[in-house]
Design a protein with these regions (language model features):
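Structural beta-sheet core signal
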Residues: 6, 28, 96-98, 138, ...
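Short gly/ser/thr-rich secondary-structure transition/capping motifs
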Residues: 50-57, 138-139, 182-184
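Short, conserved active-site loop motifs that form the nucleotide-linked donor/cofactor pocket
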Residues: 53-55, 94, 178
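NAD(P)+-binding Rossmann beta1-loop-alpha1 motif at the extreme N-terminus of oxidoreductases
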Residues: 1-50, 54-59, 85, 89, ...
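Internal alpha-helical scaffold of NAD(P)-dependent oxidoreductase catalytic cores
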Residues: 78, 89, 126-136, 153-234
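Rossmann-like NAD(P)(H) cofactor-binding subdomain of soluble oxidoreductases
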Residues: 57, 62-65, 69-152, 169
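Electropositive phosphate-/nucleotide-binding environments in soluble metabolic enzymes
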Residues: 10, 14, 33, 57, ...
Length: 234
């Protein structure tokens, strides 16, 4: 069975690599060779014990040669830079399923009112724009890295316009401790993944100000309605 790739050695990237290792051998890409060596030598990084089925590398060409299914798990601020380095080795045969919560702004303009729709891209749109890859998707859900690394029961949504992307994502990720669901509404999933963070922050602010569950429930329900409005406009 072919290896699966993960790009990014942050907490979520490491946790995802361990989850994938239940079903597959995994290559995880580290930005620096010394990080890859530490993972391979100590089998531990950032407080997480790394599966023996996970091998760390620092070569983009190798990960694209060995893996047709790749999960880029890097911050949105670094996502385009990563794609620029990766794209010489990508082909339309690859599948990229990202786990990045964020939007890419194509302009240097900082005033939100002046932004145009074509200047704001989801990570899937950015992949399509910057690479030759056609089959793209994202994963999103209650995916706290600490709980995943502790092997607590969890789940995620694999979203893509292409059913074979969803199928490949499910086959790679699904296990007795991790449920995987599919959706063809990739843009809706990406937008919700971004906007829910603001609602979560606001809920924490309400609690800090001494407000109770009624206020938080109102915030969450109206926040969800606003997410829907935003999604329709997007």
């Amino acid at each position: 069975m072919q290896k699966v790739g993960v790009i990014g050695t942050g907490n979520f990237g490491l946790a995802l690599a361990n989850l994938l290792s239940i079903n597959r051998e995994v290559l995880i890409h580290a930005r620096r060779e010394e990080i890859a060596e530490k993972i391979n030598t100590t089998r531990e990084y950032k407080g997480q014990v790394i599966s023996e089925k996970v091998v760390a590398i620092s070569d983009f060409e190798e990960i694209t040669r060995e893996c047709k299914l790749i999960f880029p798990i890097v911050p949105s601020s670094n996502f385009k830079e990563m794609l620029v380095q990766l794209r010489p080795f990508l082909t339309p045969e690859h599948i990229l399923i990202h786990g990045t919560k964020g939007l890419h702004i194509e302009s240097d303009i900082n005033v939100v009112e002046e932004l145009q729709r074509h200047e704001v891209l989801t990570m899937s749109e950015l992949i399509l724009k910057e690479t030759s890859v056609v089959r793209v998707g994202c994963i999103a859900g209650p995916n706290l890295a600490k709980e995943l690394s502790d092997k607590q029961v969890g789940g995620t949504v694999v979203a893509s316009r292409y059913n074979d992307v969803i199928t490949e994502g499910k086959k790679a990720l699904h296990s007795s401790i991790f449920r995987v669901y599919g959706s063809n509404e990739v843009m809706g999933v990406e937008i919700a993944s971004v906007l829910k963070n603001y609602i979560a922050i606001a809920a924490g602010m309400l609690e800090g100000l001494g407000y109770g569950d009624n206020s938080k429930a109102l915030l969450i329900t109206r926040g969800m309605a606003e997410m829907i409005f935003f999604g329709k406009a997007f």
